[in-house]
């Protein structure tokens, strides 16, 4: 006597035949034994605690609206109408949409361009320092790290500059899940001391598309972030997506270093052959 209408597959045989019994069997509604994503107190809370431990964060949130929802929650947490936020020109559209929603004012930093490859690079420390000096009342600095093309900024330096100016540092880490588990890779947002980071587990962590983590540091109030998330997040959180996040987190925690060591070796081989 509850949703979803497919009744764990019995109510929609065609869907069951396409996805399989196990898949539709996991697609259930929030109920007390399964916890609730909007206010987790048991199994979802445990999954979030394990994720926070794996990513060395003060707290982690399971996100089922893609990293778009993670990025927007970061910005809405720290920005109010009229606040300035320093960010690169090559931000994801979710950043711009968040500014529309909260009324914050962007202060753009133009990234350098690699003329030979025709791609934008990371935020340069000098340019960030200029923006901070020119806009001392800005509330935060947002960094793409890495960019879509894998370019990293000097994240530790930018975090330190932001904090020295009394600003938060937010990181769109959509393409940087592997930074937390590989050896010899660029520094992760949490290791660099960032206040919040959005991590696309489905991009390089192995979870299902649309699943993501929002990570926060010790100086961000987890309860307030939960309130912001619940302003926009569905009240029918997908247990398929949440399960995939938890399983993929465990997989990386146990096997991440060896997986990404192999990936680095493959990338080095491909680079050598291409060159």
Where do the PLM segments sit?
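Conserved PLP-enzyme active-site core in the AAT-like
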Residues: 15-18, 36-39, 54-57, 67-275
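Generic preference for hydrophobic/aromatic residues in regular secondary structure cores
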Residues: 1-7, 60-61, 272-275
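Conserved N-terminal alpha-helix of the aminotransferase class I/II PLP-enzyme fold
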Residues: 21-69
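N-terminal glycine-rich, Lys/His-bearing helix-loop that initiates the first secondary-structure elements
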Residues: 1-24
